[in-house]
Amino acid sequence: MIGRLHGKIIEKQPPEMVIDVQGVGYEVLLPMTSFYSLPQVGEEATIFTHLVVREDAHLLFGFAQKQDRTLFRELIKTNGVGPKLALAILSAMSVSQFANAVENEELAKLTKIPGIGRKTAERLLVELKGKFKGVAQSDFFEEHSVETIVATHSHDPADEARDALVALGYKLADAEKMIKKVNKAGATSEQLIREALKASL
């Protein structure tokens, strides 16, 4: 199991990055909540990882904080929630927002996330309710500052933001509408994604 990577960021294309660790480039998928805090391309970063082994691929998922990975691991244990859906959940909400939604049984909030219908949302409530109460504060609710968002190398931030939302499970038409609502001159793709996700909840 690869649990942690430290190296130089050589590519950033939401929701994916490539990190060079001693000459080996690892492709890593990150939730947008973690992607926002990445430093610039060319700078060093440390990410916590979870390796998913499938018949057709080995997928590496990365997280800025341990508590994000802890929640990811809880989510993929839930029946009907795969790694891609867990990534979409963590992109739409912070760990504390998700925990509050589950503890307060806010079904409507959960069903706004792409890929989560009423049945899946109900299953999440049943299987995860109460789990957050016994978890150590440091595991789930560690406060951390988000670094300044840095523009990624892109021809059109709006197109890049739209593609990232599609990669997270949104339909193309919905992603285009979401970006159109928040698009403004000078905004980076990461800012547009953040605003679009915030507006959708």
Swiss-Prot record:
Sorted UniProt keywords: Cytoplasm, DNA damage, DNA recombination, DNA repair, DNA-binding
UniProt cross-references to InterPro entries, sorted A to Z: DNA_helicase_Holl-junc_RuvA_I (IPR013849), Hlx-hairpin-Hlx_DNA-bd_motif (IPR003583), NA-bd_OB-fold (IPR012340), RuvA (IPR000085), RuvA_2-like (IPR010994), RuvA_C (IPR011114), RuvA_C_sf (IPR036267)
CDD domains, alphabetized: UBA_RuvA_C (cd14332)
Region of interest: Domain III: 154-201
Gene3D superfamilies in the record: 5' to 3' exonuclease, C-terminal subdomain, DNA helicase RuvA subunit, C-terminal domain, Nucleic acid-binding proteins
Start and end residues of each stretch annotated as Flexible linker: 144-154
Major site of localization recorded for this protein: cytoplasm
One term of GO molecular function: four-way junction helicase activity
Gene Ontology annotations for the cellular component aspect, listed alphabetically: cytoplasm; Holliday junction helicase complex; Holliday junction resolvase complex
Domain of life the protein comes from: Bacteria
Region described as Domain II: 65-143
GO biological process: DNA recombination; DNA repair
Signal peptide: none
Pfam families associated with the record: HHH_5, RuvA_C, RuvA_N
Region annotated Domain I, chain positions: 1-64
Location relative to the cell: Cytoplasm
Family in the record: Belongs to the RuvA family.
Free-text comment on this protein's domains from its UniProt entry: Has three domains with a flexible linker between the domains II and III and assumes an 'L' shape. Domain III is highly mobile and contacts RuvB.
UniProt function note: The RuvA-RuvB-RuvC complex processes Holliday junction (HJ) DNA during genetic recombination and DNA repair, while the RuvA-RuvB complex plays an important role in the rescue of blocked DNA replication forks via replication fork reversal (RFR). RuvA specifically binds to HJ cruciform DNA, conferring on it an open structure. The RuvB hexamer acts as an ATP-dependent pump, pulling dsDNA into and through the RuvAB complex. HJ branch migration allows RuvC to scan DNA until it finds its consensus sequence, where it cleaves and resolves the cruciform DNA.
SUBUNIT field: Homotetramer. Forms an RuvA(8)-RuvB(12)-Holliday junction (HJ) complex. HJ DNA is sandwiched between 2 RuvA tetramers; dsDNA enters through RuvA and exits via RuvB. An RuvB hexamer assembles on each DNA strand where it exits the tetramer. Each RuvB hexamer is contacted by two RuvA subunits (via domain III) on 2 adjacent RuvB subunits; this complex drives branch migration. In the full resolvosome a probable DNA-RuvA(4)-RuvB(12)-RuvC(2) complex forms which resolves the HJ.
Protein name: Holliday junction branch migration complex subunit RuvA
Organism: Actinobacillus pleuropneumoniae serotype 5b (strain L20)
Gene: ruvA
